[in-house]
Amino acid sequence: MLIDKLERAFVRLVLLLFGSLKIVGLENIPVEGPYILAVNHMSKADPPLVMISWPPMAKIRFFAAEKWEKHLIFGPLMRHQGAIYINRGEVDRRALRQALAALGEGAVFGLAPEGTRSRVAALIQARDGAAYLASRAGVPIVPVGMVNTDLLGHNMAHLRRTHLETRVGQPFSLPDTVHRPKGDELAACTHLIMIHIAALLPERYWGFYADSPALEALLKGEDPWPACLDVSKAAVPQPET
């Protein structure tokens, strides 16, 4: 549609002024949905950069904080893009149901498993929403790592260009043994998603997952799932989704 083309053109124009974008792993993007696009989140620029990294025919649905719903400019744009507004202060079952319905209709659903923008320029402990959706919808997950977006704001303020990267990993699915996981098993699924994102990123971004035995196993080409289960048992409990 014309609006989609204009939005992409605007993002590309801004990018041309302030930096460059390299996309790695385009061959890993599925031809069609449904699937979950799980990405790290360090900058307000991440969503539009993901949008222009993806093929134009892929309409990406996504969660957005409720505060944007009535924004004069971004509100209408987000509604056009298919945003599902979510209350991030609680488990928003209404938003989760809408996301599951979208996946059931074949959508590509993008979200940051961390649930918010990281303020420490590295991965923070994720919430269980992405794992919940993937397990309930039975869809694959495409991990995405955004590189150098944490530098964008500072560099723009100092009129410096930023060389950005979108790194797309191979799609994967939760283990066949997982059926409607809860508790430790759901936390293990979340850990599995996050180490797949971490594996795409430079080590300086690993953050909360830097010492994960599961990440170490994945990087060695081994099955990380047993280590994910072990790690989840020692994790800080989260509210049940």
Annotated model-derived regions:
Residues 22-32:
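Membrane-interface helix-loop junction between the first two transmembrane segments
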Residues 2-6, 94-241:
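Non-catalytic C-terminal accessory region of glycerolipid acyltransferases
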Residues 16-24, 147-150:
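Short gly/ser/thr-rich secondary-structure transition/capping motifs
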Residues 23, 71, 93-96:
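Structural motif corresponding to alpha-helix initiation and N-cap regions
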Residues 25, 64-65, 82, 112-113, ...:
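A secondary-structure boundary/capping signal
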